[in-house]
Amino acid sequence: MENLEAKILEADSLEVLEKVRIELFGKKGLLAAQFAKMKDIPGPEKKAFAEGLNKQKTALQEAFDARYEVLKAEEIEKMLKSEAIDISLYGAVAEKGALHPVMETMDKIIDYFVALNFAVETGPMVEDDFHNFEALNLPKYHPARDMQDTFYFKDSGLLRTHTSPVQIRTMLETKPPIRMIAPGSVFRRDYDLTHTPMFHQVEGLVVDEKGKVSFANLKAILTDFLQYMFGDVEVRFRPSFFPFTEPSAEVDISCIFCEGKGCRVCSHTGWLEVLGCGIVDPNVFKAVGYEDVSGYAFGLGVERFAMLMHKIPDLRSLFEGDIRLLEQFR
């Protein structure tokens, strides 16, 4: 018995212990051979022999189980040590993303007007002639339509050339007073250093009872907005023409590159054109069924603002997905 237990305790691996198990407990093992002898033992002695053999088997099984647990634990410990990971080592650090400079600029513009209680309105990019042109005082064959090279679909419809149709849809669905901006993508057939076929605009509209909205209000809010975007710049309004506003104006800021002294960027004028605005033409209000109201509207190109804020010379580079350029704006 002691020799058999010693065999179990001397096993130094699970493989060796398995061989001992087969030798002791297998069908042809030592214990099986002892139980086979019972048939030759006389009746009176058989009971005592069986009891002694069962006790021996139980003791050996307990010794085997205990040794198995010890060896199993040692094997697991060895495996864990061999597969250990030094958690103090730095892993692969994922680079953080960032907003595209156009979207960052768009968000900054929207934040300004939302703080002044302007609603943010959206509309479809595929428009019809009425919302994109006719309701904005651009009837068929109006020469001003040539100012915007339009993408037309074969059957009907077009890609909107500005976000002004959102203003028309809002006025058709809402009664005055209205304070809204319409940010979004617009499309024109143009591609050069300062134009792309798809770009982004933010247009604004304020409508109220006649006499409550004036050009002075428009100048005040746009001057404050431009100084919010570009810092302490001078702002000037120049007479201009837009079919949907009368009077109309182009808005310039003193050149942020030369501080108004004159440079190549501002064509040595000291000024940079940034947006257009004006008092809403009565024909626009007539198209949406408004009476006895007045209002002002303005519109700006987000890419133009992004180029000025980040001093980007070529508009097209904003849409080429060049990581070397974009990672500079994190």
From Swiss-Prot:
Any one Gene Ontology molecular-function term assigned to this protein's record: magnesium ion binding
CC cofactor note: Binds 2 magnesium ions per tetramer.
Keywords: Aminoacyl-tRNA synthetase, ATP-binding, Cytoplasm, Ligase, Magnesium, Metal-binding, Nucleotide-binding, Protein biosynthesis
InterPro entries: aa-tRNA-synth_II, aa-tRNA-synth_II/BPL/LPL, Phe-tRNA-synth_IIc_asu, Phe-tRNA_ligase_II_N, Phe_tRNA_ligase_alpha1_bac, Phenylalanyl-tRNA_Synthase, tRNA-bd_arm
GO biological process, one term: phenylalanyl-tRNA aminoacylation
Secreted is among the record's keywords: no
Main localization, broad class: cytoplasm
Entry's localization field: Cytoplasm
Necessary cofactors: Mg(2+)
Highest taxon of the lineage: Bacteria
EC numbers, comma separated: 6.1.1.20
Binding-site residues for Mg(2+), renumbered to this chain: 246
UniProt catalytic activity: tRNA(Phe) + L-phenylalanine + ATP = L-phenylalanyl-tRNA(Phe) + AMP + diphosphate + H(+)
GO cellular component, one term: cytoplasm
Top EC class, one word: ligase
Family as reported in the entry's similarity comment: Belongs to the class-II aminoacyl-tRNA synthetase family. Phe-tRNA synthetase alpha subunit type 1 subfamily.
Subunit (UniProt): Tetramer of two alpha and two beta subunits.
Protein name: Phenylalanine--tRNA ligase alpha subunit
Annotated source species: Sulfurovum sp. (strain NBC37-1)
